[in-house]
Structures are given as structure tokens and as C-alpha cells.
Amino acid sequence: IAGEIAERFREIMVDEYQDSNEIQDAIFEALTADKQNCFMVGDVKQSIYQFRLANPEIFIEKYNTYSSAEKAKAGEGRRVLLSHNFRSSAGIISAVNDVFSLCMSPKMGGLVYGPDEQLQEGIPHISINEPEVSLYAIDVQNDTYAEESAFVADQICELLNGKHFVRDGENLRTVQPEDIVILLRSPSSV
């Protein structure tokens, strides 16, 4: 049956491959058996669906199986790294690289986050003469997280005071409320 279905497709493209599970991967394998027509895109750093049985080890196994695009032979599957980031500033890219270089290893995260895996700046840098990334450790004294909430509110007020800038295309403009996002571990953190 898989062979019959596979005949309908010239190419199989899988996005967010790092969030695939064993059943999904078996389907991809059945549909592409003995062919080089499966294109998978993923980033193990973005694997967030393990609670839905996603297995990032599947992605890592494929990542380690394929040769780099430069070393792969004709007709052979290859690994193409999309490392140029066209959305983020140099400060954000540097911070991401620093964090993941420290915390990713074969034992933690499944692979080494080395020079080949690190993000590269894809757009020209515009200096804004202030830190683009700030990390804070807040000593939370109780389960209400009131101190943390107050700190975040103060930081937002500071950003909106007209003295801080963000990139807007090739220009800079003052930070607006729609430029700010707060990431939470879970909705119950609100």
C-alpha cells in the first residue's frame, strides 16, 4: 500500500522534523523507500513536543547519518546547514550561540553545538549602543512570583521610555509595546 501511495508523490517535504515521532518517521520511510525524495527540515534546539511523543533522537540520528553537502556523493542524501539568520540582530545571535555552545553536547541535547551548527548573521548589523540581550537572575521568595512580575513590569516601562531602540528594516526606531514578548514556561506562570 505504501508503495502505491508513494507513487503519487515526487517529493516528500517534512518541516519541524525534530518533533517527529517513531510512527510518523515510519510513514516517511515507507513513502520514500529506496528513493532520495525526502526533504526534512528541523532544528533540535526547537524540539518542544516531547509531551506529544516527539522524539528528537530521530532527528539527531538522521543529522549524524548524512554527510555534509560538500562531502556527499552524487545520489546520496546530504545534510545542508541553514545557519544564516536573517531575522535576528548580532547580539541575539551571539547570545544564542553562547548559550547553546555551553549547554549542548552529545550527552545533553544530543549533538555538539560547534562552529558548523552556530548561527551566522545574515543581515548587516546596526549598532544601537546598548546591550541587545540581558539576562537576570531573580530571587523569588514565594510561589506568587510577585517579585518577578514587578521586575518584568519595571523592565517593560524602561524599554518604553523612548530611550531604547529596535531595528526596523534598515532603520532604528523606539521600542513599542508590540515589540515586546514575554516567554513563560506554562500558562499557570501568568
Enumerate the predicted regions with their spans.
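Conserved helicase NTPase motor core
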Residues: 1-62, 81-91
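Short helix/loop segment immediately N-terminal to the Walker
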Residues: 1-8, 72-75, 111, 159-176
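Short, well-ordered loop/turn elements at secondary-structure boundaries
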Residues: 7-8, 22, 34-35, 76, ...
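Non-catalytic alpha-helical coupling and interface elements of nucleotide-dependent molecular machines
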Residues: 14, 33-36, 64-71, 97-105, ...
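Conserved RecA-like ASCE P-loop NTPase motor core of nucleic-acid helicases/translocases
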Residues: 15, 41, 80-84, 152, ...
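Well-ordered alpha-helical segments embedded in enzymatic catalytic cores
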Residues: 23-27, 58, 147-158, 189
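Short glycine-/polar-rich loops that comprise or flank the Walker A/P-loop
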Residues: 34-37, 43-45, 69, 73-79, ...
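Helicase-core coupling region on the C-terminal RecA-like lobe
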Residues: 81-161, 167, 172
